[in-house]
Amino acid sequence: MKDAGNRAKHGVSLTLAAELDWDAALVWVDDRFAYAEFRMIALAPTTGILYYVAFVDRASVRRIISLRRANRREVKHYVESI
């Protein structure tokens, strides 16, 4: 259900997160709101495309909340930060 919603909204399956290059990801804490859990944001590449992903790490499991292609501003931020 969550995956179907993400595909409808962003055109990307949450399962794509398994293919992201997490070692090359730019990761930071998502502190925009007072979430009930410790959320993270990442800009992570795969096959020449940069993705914006919101996630939570729970023990040894990474739960993907949202995944979409990064916009121009986010790509610029990633390039300037690496």
Task: Identify the residue ranges that each predicted region occupies.
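Ribonuclease/tRNase effector modules and their secretory precursors
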Residues: 1-82
